[in-house]
Amino acid sequence: MIKDFVAIDLETTGLSPYDNKIIELGAVRYRDGKPVDQYNTLINPGVHIPERITEITGIDDDMVSKAPYIDDELDRIMEFIGNDVILGHNVIFDYTFIAGALAGHSIEYSAEAIDTLKFAKKVLSAN
């Protein structure tokens, strides 16, 4: 069982890492299975947040207007995540947005990722 990892969750302006932007990133670092640190920031996407996304996330244009842009926050995000295993629900979604932002700076990123959605599907289908 993995006891050291970073759990992440993103909110975005849509589903495509090519066409949409990150608007919030939250992460919690675990050591020995216990939370030891957290990181959370709103991100200014530089574009209008669609009304539907505001309905889903509660995040609107005013909330992100003074938030940092993803380019200004990437170093802090990656410093927090480090080389840890990434854990999240449908984590491939979050992973592709982060990797896409890094690729825009010619930074390759690969880390082990554990998707709790896959575990949930297995558990639920077994019952």
Locations of regions flagged by a protein language model:
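Conserved non-catalytic scaffold segment of RNase H-like nuclease domains
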Residues: M1-E112, S125-A126
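A short, structured active-site edge motif that brings together acidic residues
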Residues: A111-A120
